[in-house]
Design a protein with these regions (language model features):
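Flexible loop/hinge segments that line or gate small-molecule binding clefts
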Residues: 106-144, 148, 160-171, 175-177, ...
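Short, solvent-exposed amphipathic alpha-helices that sit
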Residues: 44-59, 145-149, 184-212, 216, ...
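Hydrophobic alpha-helical
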Residues: 92-112, 193, 217-296
């Protein structure tokens, strides 16, 4: 009986050491790669996840994907669960990219468990990430997508101005769909997508773009859920088309979206109204960002005009390699492909895509 009691006590103590997770007890060596997604519902991130799974499977690594379904609270709880279960590295696509508090909380959790931490895709603070030597960020030059989208839009408008100016007033009216408030990528794409298009138009002697609704001082429509979703793009466009039309002489002549999902949602609404069907009728130019497979198909079908490619495979490979480097105690950016920024970040380049 004494031997049985001693054995039970030993098991309880062993479990306690694992459950506490903290400090050196939570060594990253040999643990699984815990990957936290802000949502499984994002089309671009689904392509990143598929590429990441492929790379991890090829390397024989143990990993687990977690879906926060848009909830920062859920994601934070998932991270703690993974730490307690013995994760070897935390890979985080943060839900609340606008919150330094959320970022700091995740960093503190990683620090307390002595675990490497890789943020990716959704922007986080340089100051916070740089303060933890086992942390890194994989993203993009968030201003680049907006600049490239704006240039692409401006060049397309200049080349096709009269056909796009449906009411012949000499000005192109547009709508801008913004993915999320407080998100640096969304802010930059919203700003530069218009500013750079205007610069190209000005160089060609054309007037600046004009937001379709003069009463909207922000000059964009934002996904109130911060989900960058096709549903929001479609709902907004459907509402617009009830008041703005060719018959009324005020049709929206250009659609700019922060991502492909919102662009594709707008296209669905346009097609329901008889536009963008490649049937000899009117096509409203629609631009997005990501170059998802569905967007590429839409461009091939001529229902979408162009997009900016965000390299899903490149991002996935960089995240996996950095995570594995950190777990192995190597230089975090060893053999990583991309544009390094200081000692905290690597950017995956964009490219224009029009078919």
């Amino acid at each position: 009986m004494k031997k049985i009691i001693a054995l039970l006590l030993a098991l309880v103590m062993a479990f306690g050491l694992v459950a506490c997770g903290g400090g050196e007890a939570a060594s990253s060596e040999g643990g699984e790669i815990a990957i936290f997604w802000y949502t499984f519902g994002d089309t671009y991130l689904s392509s990143v996840r598929a590429a990441m799974n492929e790379a991890l499977n090829a390397s024989g690594a143990k990993y687990h994907n977690y879906d926060a379904n848009g909830s920062q609270t859920t994601q934070t709880e998932q991270i703690q669960t993974a730490i307690t279960a013995g994760a070897g590295v935390l890979v985080v696509n943060i839900v609340d990219a606008s919150s330094d508090d959320a970022t700091q909380a995740i960093i503190d959790m990683a620090k307390n468990a002595n675990l490497p931490l890789v943020f990716f895709n959704r922007s986080v603070s340089e100051e916070l990430v740089s303060a933890y030597d086992k942390a890194a960020y994989v993203g993009t030059d968030y201003t680049m997508a907006g600049h490239m989208e704006g240039k692409m839009i401006g060049e397309h408008l200049v080349a096709n101005y009269d056909a796009i100016d449906l009411n012949g007033d000499g000005v192109i009216s547009y709508v801008m769909f913004k993915g999320q408030e407080g998100n640096m990528e969304a802010d930059a794409r919203t700003q530069y997508g218009v500013e750079d298009a205007d610069a190209v138009l000005a160089a060609a002697g054309k007037p600046a773009l004009e937001f379709y609704d003069a009463s909207n001082t922000s000059k964009y429509l934002v996904d109130q859920n911060g989900a960058w979703s096709a549903a929001e793009g479609q709902n907004y466009m459907q509402t617009i088309l009830t008041q703005y039309s060719e018959a009324n002489g005020n049709m929206v002549e250009l659609v700019i979206a922060n991502n492909d999902d919102m662009a594709l949602g707008a296209i669905a609404a346009l097609q329901a109204a008889g536009y963008n069907k490649n049937d000899g009728g009117v096509t409203i130019p629609v631009f997005g960002v990501d170059a998802t497979a569905v967007a590429q198909e839409a461009i091939a079908a001529k229902s979408m005009t162009g997009t900016i490619k965000q390299d899903a495979v490149g991002m996935a490979n960089a995240v996996v390699l950095i995570a594995q480097n950190l777990m192995a105690g190597k230089d975090k950016f060893e053999n990583v492909q991309g544009d390094l920024e200081g000692t905290w970040r690597v950017n995956i380049p964009y490219s224009a895509y029009s078919g």
